[in-house]
Design a protein with these regions (language model features):
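N-terminal Rossmann-fold cofactor-binding loop
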Residues: 30-34, 49-50
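Rossmann-fold cofactor-recognition segment
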Residues: 41-53, 73
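Short amphipathic alpha-helix with an adjacent loop that forms part of the alpha/beta core around
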Residues: 54-63
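NAD(P)-cofactor binding segment of oxidoreductase domains
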Residues: 63-120, 135-137
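Conserved beta-loop-beta element that borders a ligand/cofactor-binding pocket
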Residues: 95, 137-160
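Glycine/proline-rich active-site loop of Rossmann-fold NAD(P)-dependent oxidoreductases
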Residues: 159-170
Length: 174
């Protein structure tokens, strides 16, 4: 398959891209082009400014991918800048369990209502993290219902290449 990974040079994106390559997929990564990677000529590269609509349009318009895996969309505008310009058979949005409000011990997928909540186009700095992630999903549910998309909601993401030191923070504060 022809797969576009938006992100993919840091954190668990590295492992994802390597696994996709191992499985024989034709992988393109879309990044700012600032973080070195070890993929060599095994991937195609597209340089983007993720939060700039014109950059996204120029980089993606007219291109087709079987699958787009968007690892770095945070807000509704991030979703729009991909969904309006790239042609794909399936869009996979890496979301977060932060979209659930309230989140509780027995949270299930249907606890999230993407259809009837108040939707706004927004940028990353307009609301706290959980609100911009909700707006990103509201965009998918309300503005792109005819497209084939899925939201993968991670509860907590860690790996051996965690540059955020997220787990270390909790270990040190126990």
């Amino acid at each position: 398959m022809k797969i576009l990974v938006i992100g993919g040079t840091r954190y668990f994106g590295i492992h994802m891209v390597n696994k996709l390559l191992e499985q024989g997929h034709a992988v393109t990564i879309a990044t700012r082009g600032k973080t070195p990677d070890s993929y060599g000529d095994k991937v195609e590269r597209i340089t983007i400014q993720r939060t700039n609509e014109e950059s996204m349009r120029e980089a993606l318009q007219g291109k087709h991918f079987d699958v787009v895996i968007d690892k770095i969309a945070y807000c509704s505008n991030d979703i729009r800048y991909v969904m309006d310009y790239v042609d794909c058979d399936k869009y996979i949005y890496m979301s977060s369990t932060s979209v659930y409000n309230p989140k509780h011990m027995n949270t299930v997928e249907s606890d999230f209502d993407g259809y009837s909540k108040n939707f706004v186009w927004c940028d990353r700095k307009e609301f706290p993290y959980e609100q911009i992630k909700r707006q990103a999903e509201y965009a998918l549910w309300q503005k792109y219902p005819g497209k084939n998309w899925i939201a993968v909601r991670y509860p907590f993401a860690i790996c051996k290449d965690d540059y955020t030191k997220r787990l270390l923070f909790y270990v040190e504060h126990v």
